[in-house]
Amino acid sequence: SKGRLMAKKPRVPRTRAGGKWTEARYWGFIRSALREANRRFPPRYAAKALAKKAVIGERHRFEFQCACCDEWFKDKEVQVDHIVPAGTLRKYDDLPKFVENMFCEVDGLQVLCKPCHQKKTNAEREERKANDS
């Protein structure tokens, strides 16, 4: 509203990347780089191969079975999910567990259709919020 002074937010210290990044930005950058590297990790391909079947007479050649609803989907309609969530990466102490969970073997992964994956992700997010409170 006009005329009222608004309290300024406290400035977050920028201690990383030569004083340009906050701690949150720094850990977000590392988390993003690890997730990107994980997209090319061989067990992800193995998990998809285990859920795959050939389709004859369709425009698409393969379908993948969702581990949650057991329905069959095209490649673009499924995602590889970590059975045990990778967790958070907000500080140095989180790094070993995050990397261990992120780069798990094929038995720690499952193929889910996008709707089932979204439901699982939302449930995990709500659980994390409840535990953080």
Predicted feature residues:
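Short, charged surface segments at domain edges that flank catalytic/cofactor-binding sites
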Residues: 7-68, 98-107
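Histidine-centered nuclease catalytic patch
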Residues: 71-109
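Intrinsic structural disorder/low-complexity segments
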Residues: 63, 85, 120-123
